[in-house]
Amino acid sequence: MRNVENPIVKKSFSFAVRIVNCYKYLVKKDKYLLSLYNQLLDSGTSIGANISESQAAASKADFRNKLRISLKEAYETEFWLKLFYETEILDKKEFNSLLKDCLELIRLLTSIIKSIKLKA
């Protein structure tokens, strides 16, 4: 199942890079909120890590489960992005850009998960 040219693999990796860069910026800006920043870093990079792991899944069920974990992490990331925007940790431009990419991953993951047919 491994395919590095797969669009969701590429998009989730690019998103993880953006999250890491955002994290580095936030830590330089204000170290007092490090525990919150770590939450964003963990969930935002976990999306791509689980998608990558799904590429070596042992079965369709395993593949789907890894993608479900990625979807949960994407929803968590959406939460942290919204919280950071509402509390003025992220500016509107950065928030909108990251949120757009996060929502695209949510749509892609949802579509892929729905399309996976398992034997009853």
Identify the meaning behind each predicted range:
Residues 1-53, 57-120:
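Short, C-terminally biased terminal segments at protein or domain edges
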